[in-house]
Amino acid sequence: MNLNKQVAIVTGGASGFGAAIARRLSQAGAAVLVADLNAEGAQRMATELNAAGGRALGMACDVSKEADYRAVVDAAIAQLGGLHIVVNNAGTTHRNKPALAVTEDEFDRVYRVNLKSVYWSAQCALPHFAQQGHGVMVNVASTTGVRPGPGLTWYSGSKAAMINLTKGLALEFARSGVRINAVNPMIGETPMMADFMGMEDTPANRERFLSRIPLGRFTRPDDVASAVAFLASDDASFLTGVCLDVDGGRNI
């Protein structure tokens, strides 16, 4: 797929799914602004992409804050020459535990990062997309937003809301030439795996979760990156409001 002359923002792009997404978009020809709460990690990823022949910029960003998100959008336009793709990948979870054991602070953090980020991306990026008559947003949701499991109730609710927001925004902005889709990964090999499992990340504990996945493995960062790159490309030009499961059959 060809993303030449496209400029993309990837939030949470310093590690995990986000890093793989940033690499894949860069390999496809897009200039990439890597935004992450970890400023050093964002700069490191941008340096990697530039060294590989891409064009990238790294910035610190708290996606729950308007000023931070707007600064990232403005930087993409001013320093990379435009904005055509926004990937809302930054996210967080509470540790896997009973719903009533989740504290108010944990609840607020999950909803602030997972949902307010979509609000600010819409406020900051969608007017630009609508004005230029085209643009793509891809939200990284979760299979738990479709099929919740015990121990992740509040996290699952945040991802279900993200999926519904994706569809609502897709309807509202379709006539402006803007496509808005989501991907729903299964539990993946990222630094948050222990939190999702609610136990130490060991081979034995992983096996308990693998038994639920028909294809017999966890979601890999490259799986998510491939799905995001497809949805961001013209190969998916007639897809909007789609929530693509990247889960090895978990949601069947």
From Swiss-Prot:
GO molecular function per UniProt: 4-formylbenzenesulfonate dehydrogenase activity
Pfam families linked: adh_short_C2
Gene3D superfamilies: NAD(P)-binding Rossmann-like Domain (3.40.50.720)
Annotated catalytic residues: Y155 (proton acceptor)
Residues binding substrate, per UniProt: S142
Superkingdom, natural source: Bacteria
NCBIfam families found in the cross-reference section: PRK07231.1 (NF005559)
Protein name, per record: 4-formylbenzenesulfonate dehydrogenase TsaC1/TsaC2
Source taxonomy: Bacteria, Pseudomonadati, Pseudomonadota, Betaproteobacteria, Burkholderiales
